[in-house]
Amino acid sequence: MRILLANKFYYSRGGDCIYTMNLEKLLKAKGHEVAVYAMQYPENEQSEWSCYWPANMTGLRAVVRPFGVRQVVRGFSRLIDDFRPDVVHLNNIHSQLSPVIAEIAHSKGVRVVWTLHDSKLVCPCYTCSRKIGGKLTWCTECFTDKTAVIRHRCLHGSLPGSVIGYLEARKWNRERLERCTDVFLPPSQFMKDTCVAGGYTAEKFSVLCNFIDVAKIPPFEDMPKGDYCVYLGRVNEVKGVPTLCKAAARLGKRLIVIGGGEMLPQLKQEYAGCADIEFLGQMNWDDFMPIVRKARFMVLPAEWSENNPLTVIESQSLGTPVLGARIGGIPELIEEGVTGMTFTSGDVDDLAAKISAMWNYSFDYRAIAMNAVEQYSSEAYYDKLMRYYRGED
C-alpha cells in the first residue's frame, strides 16, 4: 500500500512523534511505500518529503494556521497528487497543520485514519483539565459550552490565545471532522469514552493500543532487582513528580528520576540534601533502559489524564512492574497485583503506602515481560492496523 503519515513534527519530541516515526519504520519494513507530512522545524530529521511541508509556525502564522491556510492546502494537495496514497494516517495535526488536510484527503477519495494522542477533538487546550484552587482538575465544560475556553483563558492564561482556540474548535467541529474521517483510533478506552462524552459518534472509534519495537527489548534474564524505584518522563507538576518526591523522601526509599523538564532545577535544589533521591536528567533509550530493567518498579504518578503512556508498556516489556496513578488510561495497562498496582492520583499518603507495598511484593518478572512483549509487539499492532487501512473495521 501507499501510506501517507501526517504529524506536526518529525523528530523525537514527544510520544506522538516517536509513534509516527516508529510506525514509518514498521510500514517500510513490511514493504509499503510511505510518505510523511509535517511542519518545517529546525530539529526535524531529514526527509525526502520536506519540500511539501509548510513553514515553521511563527508570528502571524500562529494566528491563521489553525484554520487551514493556503500554504498547507497547496503543499498537501500537491503531495496527495504526486504520491497518490491509498491511506492518509493522521496523528497530531491541529494548529500547526490543521484538519484541513483530512478534508483534502477525503475530497480526493483517500481513506483517512486518525490516531488520537490527546483530547484536542473535544478540548481546545488538549487535556480536558484546568487549575481550580491551584489544583489541576478534570474539566468537561467545553463539551456543552465552547466559550468556556475563553471564560477560563485555558490556553496559557491568554485571552487572545483562548479566543483562537475557541474559533478553531468552532470551525473544526464534530460534524465536520466525522465527515472527513473514516475511523478514529484512540489508544485507550479512556480516550474513546472522553470523545464520545464530548459528542462524537461511538461507532467512528476503535481502540488500538500503542506498540513497541520488540527488537530494542533485550531477551529477558533472571537477575536480582536493584534497591530502587524509577520515574521516567517529563519533570513537571502535571506528571506528579513533586508528589512522588515527597512520598519517596518520607519513606527513605531510593528513587531515581530520569527526564528533563521545567521543574528539574527546582526539585534538584529542594532535595539536594536527600540521599535517597537522584536526578539523572534527560537520557536516551540505550542509557536509561538498563536502569529501568533493574528497577524494583517504575512509578507513573500522573496528575493529569494520560492517554496510553508508552513508559508503562516499555517498563513492563523489560520485566519491570508499574505503580501508576488511577487516572486517564493508565489503569487499563496495569493488572492489579500482577503487572503492578495503582494509587489515587495526587494523594501522597496513598502513593507512599503503595510504594511500600510494591517494595516488598513478589512479582513474576518473567511473566510480566513475556506477556507485554506479546501483547504490545509491532507484529500484533501491524495486523490490527492493516484491517483499518483496508476498511475492514
PLM feature spans:
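A charged, aromatic-enriched C-terminal amphipathic alpha-helix characteristic of glycosyltransferases
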Residues: 360-390
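Conserved acidic donor-binding segment of nucleotide-sugar-dependent glycosyltransferases
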Residues: 336-337, 341-348, 355-362
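A conserved mid-protein helix/loop that constitutes part of the nucleotide-sugar donor-binding site
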Residues: 18, 230-250, 262-265
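Short hydrophobic beta-strand element within catalytic cores of glycosyltransferases
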Residues: 321-324
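Nucleotide-activated donor-binding/catalytic signature segment of Leloir-type glycosyltransferases, i.e.
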Residues: 266-290
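Short acidic/histidine- and often glycine-rich active-site loop of Leloir-type glycosyltransferases
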Residues: 312, 327-337, 341-342
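Carbohydrate-associated surface elements
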Residues: 190, 211
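Membrane-proximal helix-turn-helix segments that form the acceptor-binding/catalytic region
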Residues: 107, 120, 131-184, 193
